[in-house]
Amino acid sequence: MLKFNEDAIKKDVEETLALRKDVEAAVKKICEKGYDNIFLVGIGGTYAVAEELMSYLKGHSKMEIYLENAADLIAEGNTKLGEKSVMVITSVTGNTPEMTDAVRYGKEKGATIFGFVDEKDSPLAKETEILFSCKGGAYLKLLVTMLAFMKEKGEFELYDLFYQQAESLGDALINVQKEADKKTEEFAEKHGEDSM
């Protein structure tokens, strides 16, 4: 497998999960202050990941949650975004102009900006009110955030069990990648010379 680094995979998962108490404290503070809705905002890969999470949230949470593509949000706006909104974002580089502009738009509307930005000195990180900085996948970062909101709303009774089981997530992800690699190699060997 190209660029496959087991230690990096484990470390990324561990770093995100290690932020549990800080994420919980930030979410609790937001909940105590009160909010009306949550906006998951992304572009490209972060949007795709947030879209996948929305599939789960729609069926398991009564919170008012919106999924917005950063470029569309800038161009079209959203009348539901305001002072009682929470905008949740993730970014690796923190340099994507559409994300930075979307966050600025959210701030202009008075929204609380809650985000994970790997590069803490980036333009996006500087615009983010509640900032967490660690490596790792966007899905897990969004998941731990939204599960913390669900816990505060009494919508996720298995919260502690999730974290117990998440301790083995790094190993599980490594095993999945190894198994997938084996199967793709077998497929390529079997069908690599097939005519189209």
Task: Name each region found by the language model.
Residues 1-17:
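N-terminal amphipathic/basic leader segments beginning at the initiator methionine
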Residues 6-9, 23, 162:
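Hydrophobic packing residues in well-ordered alpha-helices of helical domains and bundles
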Residues 14, 18, 41-44:
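A short N-terminal beta->alpha junction/helix N-cap motif
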Residues 31-170:
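Glycine-rich phosphate-binding loops that contact phosphosugars or nucleotide phosphates
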Residues 196:
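Oxyanion-binding "anion nests"
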Residues 15-34, 176-193:
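A short, well-structured juxtamembrane/interface segment
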